[in-house]
Swiss-Prot record:
Underlying gene: ahlD
Residue numbers binding Zn(2+) 2: 121-122, 210, 256
EC number: 3.1.1.81
Protein name: N-acyl homoserine lactonase
Cofactor(s) required, per the database record: Zn(2+)
Coiled-coil residue spans: none
Task of the protein: Hydrolyzes the acyl homoserine lactones N-hexanoyl-L-homoserine lactone, N-3-oxohexanoyl-L-homoserine lactone, N-octonoyl-L-homoserine lactone, N-decanoyl-L-homoserine lactone and N-3-oxododecanoyl-L-homoserine lactone.
Record-linked SUPFAM superfamilies: Metallo-hydrolase/oxidoreductase (SSF56281)
Transmembrane segments: none
Entry note: cofactor: Binds 2 Zn(2+) ions per subunit.
Amino acid sequence: MEKDQLKVRVLETGVMEADMAWLLLKPGRIIADRNNKERQREWGEIPTHAVLIEHPEGRILWDTGVPRDWSSRWQESGMDNYFPVKTESSSESGFLDSSLAQVGLEPADIDLLILSHLHLDHAGNARLFDNGKTKIVANRKELEGVQEIMGSHLGGHLKADFEGLKIDAIEGDTEIVPGVSVIDTPGHTWGTMSLQVDLPDDGTKIFTSDAVYLRDSFGPPAIGAAVVWNNLLWLESVEKLRRIQERTNAEMIFGHESEQTSQIRWAHQGHYQ
Protein backbone atom coordinates (compact mmCIF):
# COMPACT_ATOMS: atom_id res chain seq x y z
CA MET A 1 0.00 0.00 0.00
CA GLU A 2 1.36 3.42 -0.95
CA LYS A 3 1.96 5.68 2.01
CA ASP A 4 -0.37 8.37 0.69
CA GLN A 5 -3.24 5.88 0.57
CA LEU A 6 -3.65 5.69 4.36
CA LYS A 7 -4.55 8.90 6.14
CA VAL A 8 -5.80 9.47 9.67
CA ARG A 9 -7.71 12.53 10.80
CA VAL A 10 -8.66 13.19 14.41
CA LEU A 11 -12.06 14.86 14.77
CA GLU A 12 -13.30 17.02 17.61
CA THR A 13 -16.55 15.62 19.01
CA GLY A 14 -17.36 17.72 22.07
CA VAL A 15 -15.81 18.55 25.44
CA MET A 16 -17.43 17.46 28.67
CA GLU A 17 -16.65 18.70 32.16
CA ALA A 18 -16.59 16.63 35.34
CA ASP A 19 -14.99 15.93 38.67
CA MET A 20 -11.74 14.29 37.62
CA ALA A 21 -12.17 11.60 40.29
CA TRP A 22 -14.35 9.86 37.71
CA LEU A 23 -11.23 9.36 35.62
CA LEU A 24 -8.47 9.09 38.21
CA LEU A 25 -9.08 7.88 41.75
CA LYS A 26 -7.28 9.52 44.64
CA PRO A 27 -7.64 8.78 48.36
CA GLY A 28 -10.06 10.88 50.39
CA ARG A 29 -12.01 12.25 47.42
CA ILE A 30 -15.72 12.27 46.75
CA ILE A 31 -17.35 12.79 43.37
CA ALA A 32 -19.15 16.08 42.79
CA ASP A 33 -21.80 17.10 40.28
CA ARG A 34 -21.87 20.43 38.44
CA ASN A 35 -23.88 22.07 41.21
CA ASN A 36 -21.01 21.49 43.63
CA LYS A 37 -17.97 21.84 41.41
CA GLU A 38 -16.69 24.89 43.29
CA ARG A 39 -16.10 22.65 46.32
CA GLN A 40 -13.72 20.44 44.38
CA ARG A 41 -10.14 21.16 43.44
CA GLU A 42 -10.21 19.09 40.29
CA TRP A 43 -13.25 19.90 38.20
CA GLY A 44 -11.85 19.75 34.69
CA GLU A 45 -12.35 19.30 30.98
CA ILE A 46 -12.87 15.89 29.39
CA PRO A 47 -12.37 16.14 25.62
CA THR A 48 -13.76 13.54 23.26
CA HIS A 49 -12.64 12.64 19.76
CA ALA A 50 -13.34 10.41 16.80
CA VAL A 51 -10.83 9.03 14.32
CA LEU A 52 -11.43 9.16 10.57
CA ILE A 53 -9.35 6.71 8.54
CA GLU A 54 -9.07 7.09 4.78
CA HIS A 55 -8.03 3.69 3.40
CA PRO A 56 -8.02 2.17 -0.10
CA GLU A 57 -10.71 -0.22 1.13
CA GLY A 58 -12.98 2.55 2.37
CA ARG A 59 -13.59 5.22 4.98
CA ILE A 60 -13.55 4.06 8.58
CA LEU A 61 -14.74 6.05 11.59
CA TRP A 62 -13.75 5.20 15.14
CA ASP A 63 -16.31 6.40 17.72
CA THR A 64 -18.79 9.27 17.50
CA GLY A 65 -18.43 11.51 20.59
CA VAL A 66 -21.21 13.35 22.41
CA PRO A 67 -24.55 14.32 20.84
CA ARG A 68 -25.75 17.89 20.37
CA ASP A 69 -28.88 17.16 22.41
CA TRP A 70 -26.89 15.75 25.34
CA SER A 71 -28.77 17.79 27.96
CA SER A 72 -32.16 16.26 27.25
CA ARG A 73 -30.90 12.79 26.34
CA TRP A 74 -28.78 12.41 29.45
CA GLN A 75 -31.25 13.90 31.91
CA GLU A 76 -33.03 10.69 32.90
CA SER A 77 -29.74 9.00 33.78
CA GLY A 78 -28.45 12.03 35.71
CA MET A 79 -25.32 12.13 33.58
CA ASP A 80 -26.17 15.67 32.44
CA ASN A 81 -25.22 16.85 35.93
CA TYR A 82 -22.04 14.84 36.26
CA PHE A 83 -20.76 15.24 32.69
CA PRO A 84 -22.16 18.50 31.27
CA VAL A 85 -20.88 19.40 27.82
CA LYS A 86 -19.12 22.76 27.60
CA THR A 87 -21.32 25.58 26.35
CA GLU A 88 -18.91 26.41 23.54
CA SER A 89 -19.53 22.92 22.15
CA SER A 90 -23.21 23.76 21.73
CA SER A 91 -22.36 25.99 18.76
CA GLU A 92 -21.92 24.78 15.20
CA SER A 93 -18.37 23.63 15.89
CA GLY A 94 -17.05 20.86 18.07
CA PHE A 95 -19.55 18.09 17.34
CA LEU A 96 -19.16 15.14 15.01
CA ASP A 97 -21.42 16.33 12.21
CA SER A 98 -19.63 19.68 11.93
CA SER A 99 -16.20 18.04 12.19
CA LEU A 100 -17.11 15.70 9.34
CA ALA A 101 -18.40 18.66 7.33
CA GLN A 102 -15.05 20.43 7.82
CA VAL A 103 -13.41 17.67 5.79
CA GLY A 104 -16.22 17.59 3.23
CA LEU A 105 -18.04 14.52 4.52
CA GLU A 106 -21.38 13.51 5.98
CA PRO A 107 -22.33 10.33 7.86
CA ALA A 108 -23.43 8.48 4.71
CA ASP A 109 -19.87 8.82 3.35
CA ILE A 110 -18.56 6.50 6.06
CA ASP A 111 -18.26 2.85 5.03
CA LEU A 112 -17.53 1.39 8.46
CA LEU A 113 -18.20 2.75 11.95
CA ILE A 114 -16.32 1.03 14.77
CA LEU A 115 -17.63 1.73 18.27
CA SER A 116 -14.96 1.26 20.92
CA HIS A 117 -17.79 0.62 23.37
CA LEU A 118 -21.36 1.80 23.81
CA HIS A 119 -21.08 4.53 26.45
CA LEU A 120 -22.94 7.78 25.85
CA ASP A 121 -19.83 9.79 24.89
CA HIS A 122 -18.65 7.24 22.33
CA ALA A 123 -21.85 5.87 20.81
CA GLY A 124 -23.86 9.05 21.35
CA ASN A 125 -24.08 9.80 17.63
CA ALA A 126 -24.33 6.23 16.37
CA ARG A 127 -27.83 6.79 15.00
CA LEU A 128 -26.44 9.29 12.49
CA PHE A 129 -25.08 6.23 10.71
CA ASP A 130 -28.36 4.32 10.53
CA ASN A 131 -28.45 5.24 6.86
CA GLY A 132 -28.44 1.97 4.96
CA LYS A 133 -24.86 2.60 3.79
CA THR A 134 -22.62 2.50 6.86
CA LYS A 135 -21.80 -0.82 8.51
CA ILE A 136 -21.57 -0.53 12.31
CA VAL A 137 -19.52 -2.90 14.47
CA ALA A 138 -18.71 -3.31 18.16
CA ASN A 139 -17.18 -6.00 20.33
CA ARG A 140 -19.32 -9.09 20.83
CA LYS A 141 -18.89 -8.96 24.63
CA GLU A 142 -20.15 -5.36 24.63
CA LEU A 143 -23.20 -6.27 22.56
CA GLU A 144 -23.97 -9.19 24.86
CA GLY A 145 -23.39 -7.09 27.97
CA VAL A 146 -25.87 -4.36 27.09
CA GLN A 147 -28.56 -7.01 26.71
CA GLU A 148 -28.43 -7.33 30.50
CA ILE A 149 -29.45 -3.69 31.05
CA MET A 150 -32.80 -3.39 32.79
CA GLY A 151 -34.59 -0.11 32.16
CA SER A 152 -33.35 2.74 30.01
CA HIS A 153 -29.76 3.04 31.23
CA LEU A 154 -26.96 1.56 33.28
CA GLY A 155 -24.06 3.82 34.22
CA GLY A 156 -22.75 5.35 31.00
CA HIS A 157 -24.83 3.08 28.78
CA LEU A 158 -28.01 4.68 27.44
CA LYS A 159 -30.10 2.18 25.52
CA ALA A 160 -31.56 4.97 23.38
CA ASP A 161 -28.11 5.44 21.80
CA PHE A 162 -27.95 1.98 20.27
CA GLU A 163 -31.12 -0.04 20.84
CA GLY A 164 -32.56 -1.25 17.54
CA LEU A 165 -29.46 -0.38 15.52
CA LYS A 166 -27.94 -3.13 13.39
CA ILE A 167 -24.52 -3.57 14.97
CA ASP A 168 -22.37 -6.48 13.86
CA ALA A 169 -20.06 -8.23 16.30
CA ILE A 170 -16.29 -8.52 16.13
CA GLU A 171 -14.13 -10.49 18.54
CA GLY A 172 -10.63 -10.35 19.97
CA ASP A 173 -7.68 -8.57 18.42
CA THR A 174 -8.77 -8.08 14.82
CA GLU A 175 -7.21 -6.55 11.73
CA ILE A 176 -9.94 -4.48 10.11
CA VAL A 177 -7.95 -3.63 6.98
CA PRO A 178 -4.17 -3.69 6.41
CA GLY A 179 -2.59 -1.23 8.83
CA VAL A 180 -5.70 -0.83 10.98
CA SER A 181 -6.51 -3.14 13.89
CA VAL A 182 -8.67 -3.19 16.99
CA ILE A 183 -7.25 -4.41 20.28
CA ASP A 184 -9.46 -6.26 22.76
CA THR A 185 -9.12 -4.22 25.99
CA PRO A 186 -12.04 -5.07 28.32
CA GLY A 187 -12.42 -3.81 31.87
CA HIS A 188 -13.83 -0.33 31.48
CA THR A 189 -16.88 -2.09 30.05
CA TRP A 190 -17.58 -5.66 28.95
CA GLY A 191 -16.08 -5.17 25.50
CA THR A 192 -14.06 -1.97 25.33
CA MET A 193 -11.64 -1.91 22.40
CA SER A 194 -8.63 0.22 21.46
CA LEU A 195 -7.50 1.17 17.95
CA GLN A 196 -4.05 0.64 16.44
CA VAL A 197 -3.05 2.32 13.19
CA ASP A 198 0.36 1.68 11.63
CA LEU A 199 1.36 4.63 9.46
CA PRO A 200 4.30 4.75 7.02
CA ASP A 201 5.46 8.27 7.94
CA ASP A 202 4.02 9.03 11.38
CA GLY A 203 4.49 5.58 12.91
CA THR A 204 2.09 3.59 15.04
CA LYS A 205 -0.74 5.35 16.84
CA ILE A 206 -2.79 3.67 19.55
CA PHE A 207 -6.10 5.32 20.36
CA THR A 208 -6.94 3.84 23.73
CA SER A 209 -10.55 5.00 24.05
CA ASP A 210 -11.57 4.46 27.68
CA ALA A 211 -9.26 1.51 28.20
CA VAL A 212 -6.94 4.30 29.38
CA TYR A 213 -8.52 7.66 30.19
CA LEU A 214 -5.45 9.76 30.92
CA ARG A 215 -1.66 9.78 30.78
CA ASP A 216 -1.65 9.45 34.58
CA SER A 217 -3.98 6.44 34.28
CA PHE A 218 -1.39 4.70 32.11
CA GLY A 219 1.47 5.26 34.55
CA PRO A 220 3.34 3.14 35.35
CA PRO A 221 1.90 2.22 37.70
CA ALA A 222 -1.60 2.15 36.25
CA ILE A 223 -4.11 4.09 38.37
CA GLY A 224 -7.77 3.11 38.39
CA ALA A 225 -10.92 5.14 37.91
CA ALA A 226 -14.45 5.36 39.25
CA VAL A 227 -16.03 4.14 36.02
CA VAL A 228 -14.58 0.66 35.61
CA TRP A 229 -16.75 -2.44 35.23
CA ASN A 230 -14.02 -4.98 36.12
CA ASN A 231 -10.85 -3.70 37.74
CA LEU A 232 -8.77 -6.82 37.16
CA LEU A 233 -9.61 -6.98 33.45
CA TRP A 234 -8.96 -3.24 33.20
CA LEU A 235 -5.47 -3.61 34.68
CA GLU A 236 -4.69 -6.53 32.38
CA SER A 237 -5.78 -4.43 29.41
CA VAL A 238 -3.60 -1.49 30.43
CA GLU A 239 -0.57 -3.75 30.70
CA LYS A 240 -1.43 -5.36 27.36
CA LEU A 241 -1.42 -1.92 25.75
CA ARG A 242 1.86 -1.11 27.46
CA ARG A 243 3.47 -4.21 25.95
CA ILE A 244 2.21 -3.27 22.48
CA GLN A 245 3.42 0.30 22.94
CA GLU A 246 6.88 -0.87 23.96
CA ARG A 247 7.09 -3.30 21.05
CA THR A 248 5.91 -0.84 18.39
CA ASN A 249 7.10 2.46 19.92
CA ALA A 250 3.53 3.67 19.41
CA GLU A 251 2.28 7.11 20.30
CA MET A 252 -0.51 6.68 22.85
CA ILE A 253 -3.53 8.91 22.32
CA PHE A 254 -5.62 8.57 25.45
CA GLY A 255 -9.39 8.62 25.63
CA HIS A 256 -9.94 11.88 27.52
CA GLU A 257 -6.58 13.56 28.16
CA SER A 258 -7.08 17.34 28.12
CA GLU A 259 -3.33 18.05 28.23
CA GLN A 260 -2.93 16.08 25.01
CA THR A 261 -5.34 18.20 22.96
CA SER A 262 -2.64 20.75 22.11
CA GLN A 263 -0.37 17.96 20.84
CA ILE A 264 -2.90 16.25 18.58
CA ARG A 265 -2.95 17.14 14.89
CA TRP A 266 -6.67 17.82 14.53
CA ALA A 267 -8.46 17.39 11.21
CA HIS A 268 -8.62 21.14 10.59
CA GLN A 269 -4.83 21.24 11.00
CA GLY A 270 -4.00 18.31 8.76
CA HIS A 271 -3.70 14.54 8.95
CA TYR A 272 -1.36 11.70 9.90
CA GLN A 273 -0.03 9.35 7.24
